[in-house]
Amino acid sequence: MSQLLTTRQAEELHKSIIAYLASVNLSESATTLRAELGDAVTIDDATIKKYEGLLEKKWTSVVRLQKKIMDLESRCAALQSELDSATPTSLLRKNQDPTAWLPRAPPRHTLESHRSPVTCVAFHPVFSSLASGSDDTTIKIWDWELGELERTVKGHTKAVLDVDYGGPRGGTLLASCSSDLTIKLWDPSDDYKNIRTLPGHDHSVSSVRFIPSGAAGSPMSGNLLVSASRDKTLRIWDVTTGYCVKTLSGHVDWVRAVAPSIDGRFLFAAGDDRIPRLWDLSAAETRSTFLGHEHVIECVAIAPAASYPHLAVLSGLKKPPSASSSAEFFATGSRDKTIRLWDSRGNLIKTLVGHDNWVRALAFHPGGKYLLSVSDDKTIRCWDLTQECKCVRTIADTHEHFVTCLRWAPPLIKDSGANGDAGANGTPAATTTSNGARQDPNAANKISIRCVIATGSVDQKVRVFAT
């Protein structure tokens, strides 16, 4: 008798083995085992039926548990490494310094109301409002601090693919785009009334972003909106008139994502043709192309000036570009499971490998040190730009299904008015000194950084991670 098992456990194991042998047509082996066990095990057809399949279930359970144990051991090792490298002083500094904050499990809130996958999220630049769009055709407005649903905004007739806050000075708007080929503008100060619908694209509109105030030479600063579409074009809109003022053609396939520079001079866009393009908005022409991805590009991001010192080191520059320069470094995420970092000339700086599935969204930390990414592998990954882009934190099982979107709450702007007077999705508007030099809009007090991110998923949930 095994010393590891009690008499009852041994008897159940024998019955399970006999039932298994009988189920796989090894009747002679089953008969032999029963004969050898003799009176120690009483088993009939009913007992065989009862124990049939039990051995396989226990075997698969053990395999699952072993995998879970390995995952937990890996997480524990990562946390221990993080703890070992920290001192009480550095831990205190991290707690006080928002530039060092990174999200960690569990989320502060899990927001549930959508009836189909969540495709996009966006933070109000001033208030604690969070907008989410879904394949269920609705936009939900949440109070992310309280974790409560404020309202459901209806108007689109097909999936909502992207949302963004921004607009002219003095009045923040919410823009949304959809598979119904339209862009809609909503007024948060008037119960999210639909104030304008922008038709014009010939296929699904996959991304929409307000262009920040201060676009060089533009008389419509703050009034511009850019959209990207499956019709292979980017369109620039005047939100006050609803007119399309410019169409940018050059991509040869679906344009899935677009990001404007902080001063509104440049657009960075990419999609199914695997070739990101940096557009000069005033000239309406491509300034640079970026070659390297091996599959569809799902997301793009422009690095803030705070990241320039770290990215300059990675790219081998002796000194970083001027903080007043608005489009020096970029990030792209792809279905090839990689994230790639680029300079403005189209040179590949670094390839980040770690995700096990499509990379769906990117966000640079406002403090400049980190890049965050989410993926269909259900994780959030935090990459440290000061450590050769080492992945310093992984939040596993962020959602129960593919993670489709990620947004960082924009920094609070000190002069924001009651209507949310800020740049695109809270991007600080570029300012000018008395001598005419442009100041770094990210050089504001660190206290303005909001340590809040939101993610959305195919599991129909929005999750908020915050201090």
UniProtKB/Swiss-Prot annotation:
Keyword flag Cell cycle: yes
Disulfide partners: none
GO cellular component terms given for this protein: cytoplasm; microtubule; microtubule associated complex; spindle pole
Placement of WD repeats on the sequence: 113-154, 156-196, 200-247, 250-289, 292-352, 354-393, 398-428, 429-466
Gene Ontology MF terms in the entry: dynein complex binding
Principal location: cytoplasm
Quaternary state and interactors: Self-associates. Interacts with nudE and dynein.
Family to which this protein belongs: Belongs to the WD repeat LIS1/nudF family.
Protein name according to UniProt: Nuclear distribution protein nudF 1
Organism: Aspergillus clavatus (strain ATCC 1007 / CBS 513.65 / DSM 816 / NCTC 3887 / NRRL 1 / QM 1276 / 107)
Lineage: Eukaryota, Fungi, Dikarya, Ascomycota, Pezizomycotina
